Amino acid sequence: MIRVSVMYPNEKGKRFDVNYFATKHIGLIHKKLDGAGLVRSEVDKAADPSSPFIAIGHLYFKSMEEFQTGFFTHAAEMTADIPNFTDVTPQVQISEIVK
């Protein structure tokens, strides 16, 4: 299984609407990727205002191939939604779940 973590740095003076991210943006991702290997998603919100990331979205896929096919098919529409909830540039980590 593959986990794609999209991490939004906690940058002073930047905007991040966690409610939009957790509902509308993640909803859009599910709409586009549920039939393309997306198994589930999680949204983490920083518990401490000084945390290095304000929020992290985790997307779980059956395989790297399914992630790549689904993501690249719908990347333009999903990334076009980012300005609706933030002006932070996200960092991405793709991991293979070992255990």
Language model: regions and residue ranges:
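Macromolecular interaction modules
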Residues: 1-99
